[in-house]
Amino acid sequence: MDITKLEQKNKCIFAIKLAEKASSYLQESNVKGLINEAIEVSWKWVHTEENLGEVLYNFLDNEENGFTLFQEMEKDEKNISAWDCIIDAVAYVSRAAYEKEGVKYLPEPIEIVDDNIFTHMVQSLILCDSMECEYIEKV
């Protein structure tokens, strides 16, 4: 399947589903709650298209509990790959939300997000477990 040919909303749904799957590799409870919250906000944006770009971005780049900080502290390669997938997915939905809002100036990390991120997102999930290829094909 060529993900880049999907409509924007369907690309976001695909990204969220990969993030949900990747989150199963991260067991720490306080982190799991934040990931679930980010996924819920992502789904909310897909269903409502409310102005949630900034809210989603704050899950990624937050001085106290940003996903990028948690990833930097991670030692386990599988967990780092899971974080890669989750961060990519939230960044993609954040970009879509910002664009829908008509925001002219995006945060620098979001500015570089485009459809090429799907290759990295998929590879990251497969690095968690090669059996995830089957899941990805079903999505």
Where are these regions (language model features)?
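Structured binding/interaction patches within domain cores
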Residues: 2-139
